[in-house]
Amino acid sequence: MKHLNVEFFKCCNSKTAISEVSFLLDSEDKNKLNQVPWAKYNYLPCVHFAIAYGSDCIFLKYYVKEKYIRAEHVAPNTAVYQDTCVEFFIRFEDQKAYYNFEFNCIGTMLIGYGESKADRKLLDGQLISQIKYQSVINNDRPGSDQYWELTVAIPFTLSLIHI
């Protein structure tokens, strides 16, 4: 298992502008995602991410380059996995259940908590609205790969609510 060094942003919290968080994450180490999670889908886009935390939240920024992008789902807890998306999983030491955060390229979120995909319960839409995000899509060069970034700030208070 790879260990990540996660920086503490002492100047940032859930009230910090997401654009400022995005800028700060640009100076952090980029971690490459280089494994295809499903055998039957062998397409591997170029994906990196940066991670840090503040006094009351965790910050993530994804940097993605791929052939095509799709963003059809705009409501919370809809099938963003059918769109161009990224995921983040977190489990706390004393629990069997984990959180699964899925974000499409425009920031629509699907968030669940459970011990497996089959028994996951979805977070309430009002809780999801506490997560700040910024999406940037740059597809101004026809015929070339599409590039997008997504920055999110996930409040620690969400992890205290086990649906």
Model regions: which residues?
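Structural preference for beta-rich elements and adjacent junctions enriched in aromatics
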Residues: 1-161
